[in-house]
Design a protein with these regions (language model features):
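Hydrophobic alpha-helical segments and their helix-loop junctions in multi-pass secondary transporters
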Residues: 138-142, 146-161, 170-171, 190-221, ...
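Helix-loop-helix module between adjacent transmembrane segments
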Residues: 10-11, 90-106, 110-174, 240-244, ...
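Loop-to-transmembrane helix boundary motifs in multi-pass membrane proteins
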Residues: 121-127, 131, 158-161, 271-280, ...
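Membrane-interface "cap" regions at the ends of multi-pass membrane proteins
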Residues: 10-66, 264
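Extracellular loop-to-transmembrane helix junctions
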Residues: 2-19, 72-102, 111, 331, ...
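Hydrophobic, membrane-embedded alpha-helices of multi-pass small-molecule transporters
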Residues: 47-64, 200-206, 217-283, 333-345
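Selective recognition of specific alpha-helical transmembrane segments in multi-pass small-molecule
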Residues: 4-17, 130, 134-138, 170, ...
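Extracellular/periplasmic helix-exit of transmembrane alpha-helices
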Residues: 202-214, 271-320, 390-394
């Protein structure tokens, strides 16, 4: 537990120290924000800062810092290092700059920022990539809550219809009508659950592996037949929302359109990511209790289910922990965490997709018919993907694994965009260059070794990942030299 408490403190210090440095690099000022200059009562709506923070936190979190941390905890204490360093030096920086650059550019979405800084070709690729990613995420978060709710009441089909209907309404309505009113309540429940679990951990003080016990893959050592993934690159794909997630780059612009002042960007964007990291640390620690502090009730159940993938293992941990540790109240909170959180992530995913497409088509979103023009084909594509997912036994796991890689690849686009911006503005670009190079290597290597992609031996994957790193370094060095010549 010592590593856990050190990690919690490190995240807080990271926000206060490194977050302050990152804010000075960007230099926010008092210029009018899009929420004021472009107020339209639909997507550009100024809201109270506390409400914007709570919505941003839930938008970027969903079940990510819960399920991702649970699946990443199998690697052992190495998960702590990735959550802490990834969150402070990569994820929070990524979220802050995508939100602030959106605010500085009239509330534009990530593809528009990519077009401005990386060029039209990269923007077109990212546009298709981002929309596909968001539709895929929304689809995943239709089926999984429906399956869980089916176990309580009604049929899966009924819940799918109801969740889809909610998505359509939430995507079409002004942002302050449902999202602005309901999301803060769900955010509070997630935070309350995390605080309650910390209290239980303090009382129980379980004997968990510490950093000084080694950074090897403890899951593989404890159960080689069940846990077969390598720490690199799998840990850095598995724990995304608790460290760095490209999905956040599609969500930060939503709240960039709702802030009255640039000076609140650090607590909103950087702070929400640090908060998500805190939640991820809690759930990683709780999960290690089940994996490594044996005997624990339900451990055999979880270990036996782990080879069946995400749907059976992560929610099982959540339910066991909340019911055994927090009682009846925990059961209610588990329902909010496992059902409400993915649904809220799903509807903001579709909303972001609508706005990205609308910006690309220059289609005003105030008229209802213009929103329908985009939403109808958007949800039709999602429905087709959902049908495929339901008719294939491993459809959910397949889509989720592709989402994990696509999600982190999106963060690569965002980090390189921010790096180019910092170079052009003569600002310290190394703060995003290093994360960009690292995530480029991670995503390339994972694409090579993943069984859902090329499935090559790890030796080959590492070699290709190393080549990608070298190519990225050379490309950046050549590009920066050309930029420096033009600036002279």
């Amino acid at each position: 537990m010592i590593t856990f408490f050190i990690s919690l403190a490190a995240l807080v210090v990271g926000y206060l120290v490194y977050g302050s440095f990152v804010e000075r690099v960007f230099s926010p000022d008092d210029r009018p924000t899009p929420a004021v200059a472009k107020a339209d009562g639909m997507d550009y709506v100024a809201m109270p800062y506390w409400k914007v923070f709570m919505i941003q936190f839930l938008n970027i979190a969903g079940t990510g810092p819960i399920f991702g941390a649970i699946m990443g905890a199998k690697f052992g204490p190495a998960a702590y290092l990735w959550i802490v360093f990834g969150c402070i030096f990569a994820g929070a920086v990524h979220d802050y700059f995508t939100g602030m650059l959106s605010m500085r550019n009239g509330g534009c979405d990530l593809p528009e920022l990519v077009r401005k800084y990386l060029g039209g070709g990269a923007s077109k690729v990212l546009l298709a990539f981002a929309v596909f990613l968001l539709v895929m995420l929304g689809t995943v978060f239709v089926y999984s809550p429906a399956e869980i709710l089916h176990g309580i009441w009604g049929s899966t089909t009924l819940w799918i219809v109801l969740i889809f209907a909610y998505y359509v309404v939430a995507t079409m309505l002004p942002i302050d009508k449902i999202i602005g009113k309901v999301y803060p309540l769900f955010s509070f429940s997630l935070l309350f659950m995390a605080v309650a679990l910390v209290a239980v951990l303090v009382v129980r003080m379980p004997q968990l592996p510490e950093l000084w016990d080694g950074l090897g893959n403890m899951g593989k050592a404890a159960s080689p037949s069940t846990f077969t993934d390598s720490i690199f690159p799998c840990l850095f794909i598995t724990i995304a929302c608790g460290a760095i997630s490209g999905f956040h780059a599609t969500q930060s612009p939503l709240m960039a359109r709702c802030l009255r002042s640039e000076r609140k960007g650090r607590p909103i964007f950087y702070g929400a990511m640090i908060t998500e990291g805190l939640v991820a640390l809690v759930w990683a620690t709780v999960s290690m209790c089940f994996f490594y502090d044996a005997p624990q009730p339900g451990y055999e159940q979880i270990a036996g289910a782990a080879d069946k993938g995400f749907l059976t293992s992560a929610p099982m941990v959540v339910n066991l922990v909340c019911k055994d540790w927090l009682g009846l109240l925990g059961g209610v909170l588990a329902m909010l965490g496992v059902v409400a959180a993915p649904i809220t992530s799903g509807d903001t995913a579709f909303r972001s997709a609508r706005l990205i497409i609308a910006q690309a088509l220059r289609l005003n979103q105030c008229p209802k018919k213009n929103r329908l023009y985009i939403c109808v084909p958007l949800f039709a594509a999602s429905f087709a993907m959902l049908v495929w997912q339901m008719e294939n036994p491993d459809g959910f796991n397949t889509i989720w694994q592709y989402f994990g890689w696509a999600n982190q690849t999106l963060s690569v686009f965002a980090l390189w965009t921010i790096t180019v911006y910092l170079v052009r503005e003569n600002k310290p670009y190394v703060i995003t260059l290093i994360p960009a190079l690292f995530m480029t290597t991670v995503c390339t290597t994972f694409l090579m070794v993943s069984n859902t992609a090329f499935g090559l031996p790890y030796s080959v994957g590492y070699a290709v990942g190393g080549m990608a790193l070298c190519i990225a370094i050379v490309w950046f060095a050549v590009w920066k030299r050309n930029v420096s010549k033009k600036q002279i």
